[in-house]
A protein has these predicted regions:
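A short beta-loop-alpha structural element at the N-terminal edge
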Residues: 5-19
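Conserved GNAT-fold acetyl-CoA-binding loop/helix
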Residues: 18-43
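A short helix-loop-beta-strand connector motif used in the catalytic cores of GNAT acetyltransferases and
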Residues: 44-55, 82
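Conserved beta-strand in the GNAT
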Residues: 55, 61-70, 87
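Conserved acyl-donor/pantetheine-binding loop and adjacent beta-alpha core of acyl/acetyltransferases
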Residues: 67, 75-80, 148-151
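Conserved acetyl-CoA binding element of GNAT-fold acetyltransferases
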Residues: 77-90
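Conserved acetyl-CoA-binding loop-helix of GNAT-fold acetyltransferases
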Residues: 88, 94-107
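Conserved active-site alpha-helix within GNAT-family acetyltransferase domains
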Residues: 115, 122-146, 150
Length: 177
């Protein structure tokens, strides 16, 4: 199996990102909506990026992506991260790579001061989120407390090890150390 790497996306990845967006949007009402390469580049690689975009690579192929941005929760009085646009090419799904992307996302967000992760999604990522995070009926899930802290430490481990070490959902109710 080719080594997995996760890194920050850069402007040279634009074409691959657009290909993944085209796969991601299939079946959505926006499927036929035109999307501008310039707008994508400005959104993630311009003067004021809207979020941090990560890509997963195996060999020289970009196979997945996820974005995160720093948020502030006024109820809890702390910074967190909001995850979005988590996508993995279909032939790589079920391999634990999504967990590796989320681990890197938690690691980067933690370094930026985040103490929790919130996000949601379709059936695929929601299975992971519902396994490790505390969710509401609106399918927005929060990975927080000790669970968030533990997930951040999984960054860089082999995919199978990340999946084996996934924190218990209940750890999201415990304060981080």
């Amino acid at each position: 199996m080719t080594m997995l790497s996760i890194r920050r996306a850069n402007v040279n990845d634009t074409s691959e990102i657009e290909t993944m967006v085209a796969g991601f949007v299939k079946g959505h009402p926006a499927e036929a909506h035109p999307r501008s390469s310039n707008a994508l580049r400005a959104a993630f690689f311009g003067e004021h990026p809207v979020a941090h975009l990560l890509v997963a690579e195996q060999g020289s192929e970009i196979i997945g992506m996820a974005q995160w941005r720093l948020v502030y929760d006024m109820f809890w009085g702390m910074f967190g991260a909001e995850a979005g646009w988590l996508y993995l090419k279909p032939r790589f799904r079920g391999s634990g790579i999504v967990a590796a992307l989320v681990a890197r996302l938690c690691s980067e967000a933690s370094e930026a001061g985040a103490r929790f992760l919130q996000g949601g999604g379709g059936e695929g990522p929601s299975r992971l989120y519902e396994r490790i995070a505390i969710g509401q009926s609106d399918r927005v899930c929060h990975l927080s407390g000790k669970a968030f802290q533990l997930f951040a430490t999984l960054d860089g481990l082999p995919v199978r090890e990340i999946v084996r070490r996934l924190p218990l959902k209940e750890f999201g109710l415990q304060p981080a150390d």
